[in-house]
């Protein structure tokens, strides 16, 4: 199982993506649910990957830095964890300017259903692509 956290609109909303029992299951969470999500990942002996800005800080309304929290949480429990710089997923999948993550996700992984509003679909698609990308390294 891989947990992929993706910031949305710099407000610290997270799209989670994790592979379970041969499929990929994903959902949308906000920082108040972040610890619960990591507990779930730990319980399933999972791995964690987060895309974050160059400066290493994500601003959230709750004054929580989920990226730093995740790093401390994962290291403290010995869970495999990695950061990915913004843009890495687009480069890894060769996604052109003007093309959305949702379009790429539908092309590469048609079995995954993207639900919600277009913005939510885009964030979820990014989390799915990030999780698949991280599988190579985690």
Q: What residue ranges belong to the model's regions?
A:
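Phosphate- and other anionic-substrate recognition elements at nucleic-acid/protein interfaces
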Residues: 1-138
């Amino acid at each position: 199982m891989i947990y992929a956290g993706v910031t949305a609109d710099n407000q610290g909303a997270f799209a989670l993506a994790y592979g379970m029992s041969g499929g990929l299951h994903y959902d949308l969470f906000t920082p108040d649910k972040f610890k619960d999500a990591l507990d779930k990942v730990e319980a399933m002996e999972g791995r964690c990957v987060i895309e974050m800005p160059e400066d290493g800080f994500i601003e959230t309304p709750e004054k929580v830095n989920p990226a730093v929290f995740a790093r401390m949480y994962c290291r403290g429990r010995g869970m495999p964890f990695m950061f990915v710089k913004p843009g890495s997923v687009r480069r890894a999948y060769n996604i052109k300017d003007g093309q959305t993550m949702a379009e790429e996700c539908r092309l590469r992984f048609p079995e995954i259903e993207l639900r919600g509003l277009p913005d939510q679909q885009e964030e979820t698609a990014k989390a799915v692509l990030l999780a698949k990308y991280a599988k190579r390294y985690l």
